[in-house]
């Protein structure tokens, strides 16, 4: 979304813009960084990005990674661009600013991006990415909307796991929309009984 915003503003000012995107689609963190229950927000953001990149003065080039497919040197010196603007968004988690923390990645420390990507795809038959098993006693570090989403995913997934252990399959979207207490009530359960 960062690149689409910059491209749109420059194009509106009459500047021809080329947007290089390393992924097949231009949606960045909106595509896999939002938990799947944010369907309405995701659709709205997709449309906004399509509009911005659809401006007459914008050329969009997907599947092109700077440094792999084209060098920064080439862009800056050989392609005739008057400027190269790096608007690389939030596709990578910021590391936890605690010395030695990263040695625990894969041993209990889980960053938001891989966790939400797993959550968004874990019910797909062909999902081959990293897998997580949310358990009781987790700590979510952060104070923004992403940390709220992570805490919510954790709560929803631990609830679904406990229901599955009782032979009950529960649709995640329904669980999120109706809320855990009402969903449990539908199955004749309470928080206390679920454990």
Language model features with spans:
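Beta1-alpha1 glycine-rich phosphate/pyrophosphate-binding loop at the start
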Residues: 1-66, 74, 149-195
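Short hydrophobic segments within beta-strands
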Residues: 20, 87, 140-141
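Short, ordered loop/turn segments at secondary-structure junctions
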Residues: 22-23, 89-90, 114
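Gly/Ser/Thr-rich helix-start
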Residues: 29, 90, 145
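A generic local structural motif
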Residues: 45-47, 70-73, 122-128
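Feature captures the FAD/FMN-dependent oxidoreductase FAD-binding
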Residues: 48-99, 103-105
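Glycine-rich dinucleotide-binding loop and its adjacent helix/turn
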Residues: 93-194
